[in-house]
Structures are given as structure tokens and as C-alpha cells.
């Protein structure tokens, strides 16, 4: 068994998709961890430059930067949200939604600190890993896969 990321288990196999995942899994986990290390608990502010607080702005910038590093076109919409676009050869559009804010960490973290993600027994654990930073990153990597395959 390989590493479990947000309910998906990457295994070595013959399929091209599994080979691609196996090749990029460490990078994907690194990027999920990078985003999950940001304590992006949403707070309301009067500052229009960071309407949900500095940490949420940092998470937005980190997500957009990751999209840009993958060759996509990121857009920041007045620090409220962002979009990461890729214009392929087709007129077909695919969209996915995610968020990078988290609820407060709370108590009871026994295996790690909430904003210091770790892999334990093949499972990535940390605040926001499954809701929703890991899911967002998994979708972004799926889009990267499609782009690299020439779709």
C-alpha cells in the first residue's frame, strides 16, 4: 500500500495515471503540507487588503503561487478568492472549488501539532489536510496531470 492522501491511495500499477501519481506523490504531499502549515483561521477584518485576515491571505497567495508554478494562470480577486486557469485546446471547461481557510485547531492533537503536518502509518495528518487544503491540492494536481498529458 502507498500513501493515503485525502481518502485516495496511490499504488504502483501499470496504469499511466498511477505511474504519474507515484512519480509526483512526494511533491504533492510536500505541497499539501506547505499549504497546511499556514494557520489560516478566518477572521473578519476592516482591512480591505486582507478581508479574512493575514493568514488567509497568506494561504490564498500560497495556493495561487502553486498554481503558477505548475504553469497555470492565477488570478487574485481582491483578496477574497482566487482562480487558477488553464486554457487547453478544447472549449470544454472544468471547474473545481476549494477553500484554504480552516476552523480553529482546538484541543486533543496527540500525534502532531495542528499546523505541523506529518505522515503517520501512511496517512497525512494535519489541520486542513482533508478539509479542504488536501482536496484542493489533489484537484490541482489532477489538472496538472491533464495538462501534462496534452488534454
Annotate each PLM feature.
Residues 4-5, 40, 75, 118:
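Generic low-complexity segments that are intrinsically disordered, proline-rich and/or Lys/Arg-biased
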Residues 11, 48, 135-137:
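N-terminal low-complexity, intrinsically disordered patches enriched in charged
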